[in-house]
Amino acid sequence: MNNEDLVNIVSLCKKGNTDAQKQLFCLYNKQMMFVCRRYLSTNEDCNDVLTDSFLQIFKAMSSYRFINEKALYSWIRTIVTNQCINTVKKKQHEKFSVDIEQYEQTLDKTEEQVEYEYTQEELMLCLNNIPERLRLIFNMYVIEEYSIKEIAIRLETSANTIKTSLSQARNLLKHQLVQIKNKSFR
């Protein structure tokens, strides 16, 4: 889609045109669903966040100033990412626990350097198998490139807690990736 078409869609969205809103949603929903899947474990949560995000996007559209397609994508992605983070924070009150000692014992046995290429599906599966809070922190740090301090501020916790959570997430992911590698070479 060229810039002129996108300018027209954004302009119509600002006026509340539902056809333009549908077009904008269709343009970005698959990419934004992928963003949601990195943070949230269930399709239901992803769909809820995506819906809430686009409702928020359409409400805020009147104050949005179109620059280019890349800026629009970044703006939409930021809103979706923030919605994901807020959803995870709301679920924080639910108890989660990880038997990290069990994983550390396994990791000690398999510290070898792995030269195995993982598919995107394998990586997403591993990421979805770690606790939601650890996944959130890992995504914010590795994918969204937030600093530890920024994550601590956003999640209202200490930098040391974030560092510990990152370490736990890495260990859990490493353990799962080693298991996948071992299954592949059997």
What are these regions (language model features)?
Residues 14-23, 33-52, 159, 182-186:
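Short, charged helix-capping/linker segments at alpha-helix termini
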Residues 34, 48-55, 70-82:
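Structural recognition of an alpha-helix C-terminal capping motif at a helix-to-coil junction
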Residues 63, 78-98:
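Arg/Lys-rich amphipathic alpha helix in sigma70-family domain 2
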Residues 1-30, 144, 149, 182, ...:
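N-terminal module of bacterial RNA polymerase sigma factors
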Residues 125-128, 132-136, 144-161:
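Helix-turn-helix DNA-binding module
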Residues 1-3, 12, 139, 153-156, ...:
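C-terminal edge and immediately downstream basic/flexible tail or linker adjoining helix-turn-helix-like DNA-binding
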Residues 6, 86, 94-117:
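Internal acidic/polar
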Residues 14-15, 41, 54-69:
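Sigma70-family region 2
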